[in-house]
């Protein structure tokens, strides 16, 4: 059985933070679009794309909840996607840094 997947496009900065192991929660504004794609769909896996390039990583979703975001200037509650941290082998195999 194939896992339900959510695909999210990230800026290069946030993508690199995931690969480096610093980021394990993705925040999305509470709106109809994300409510439908994340809360209602209940994905088990998230695919992050580095911008609109072919560079992608897959992570298993540990939980999805609603709560505050720790970033300055991001007020209110957000949809929070908690995902597994990539192992060193996974980040080396999937991610090829730009030269």
Question: Model-predicted segments: where are they?
Answer:
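Structured alpha/beta reader/binder surfaces that contact nucleic acids or chromatin modification marks
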Residues: 2-5, 9-99
């Amino acid at each position: 059985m194939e896992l339900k997947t959510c695909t999210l496009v990230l800026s290069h900065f946030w993508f690199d933070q995931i690969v480096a192991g610093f980021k394990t929660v993705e925040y999305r504004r509470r709106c109809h679009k994300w409510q439908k794609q994340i809360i209602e769909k209940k994905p088990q896996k998230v695919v992050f794309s580095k911008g609109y390039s072919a560079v992608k990583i897959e992570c298993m979703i540990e939980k999805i909840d609603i709560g505050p975001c720790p970033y300055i200037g991001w007020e209110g509650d957000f949809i929070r996607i908690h995902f597994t941290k990539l192992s060193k082998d996974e980040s080396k195999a999937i991610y090829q840094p730009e030269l």
